[in-house]
């Protein structure tokens, strides 16, 4: 993507935010990558907590859980806010940053609302705690929250419906989700496909 094309996409998002149509949008673009590594090499090289390799098809990795369902509860752990952990006072800088705080509050509210579509008694169990993650370029601090809700008794026979109702993930779209998805579609002008999707284990 050229800088001109990126600026055009960015301006679409900016215009909509200034108009009040969205207050958080995750703008992405395709980036060509040339490497002599195989998909398996990339998979094995990644230090991400969650990763998937489908032979000759794709590789993906993420530090973030979309949802965890067990014992009648659904949990989500949205992440927003990152800083280089080697910086002096990095954790304090991250926790005191007003932009990062605002973005995190927005995504927590969005995920809480999303979980309320499929669960009762939705609550924020832990708000804005800091995790240290190891990456190939060094350690980072990332802020997360834990949100939990109680699923109906018959949830095991409706797992697919629950997951599809929550998609796409709020952390890779924005808020309000529906309108922001329209803005993203106009700005990005490409299909994300598997990118920013989810995978899981039953």
Language-model features: where?
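Extended alpha-helical targeting/anchoring segments
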Residues: 1-202
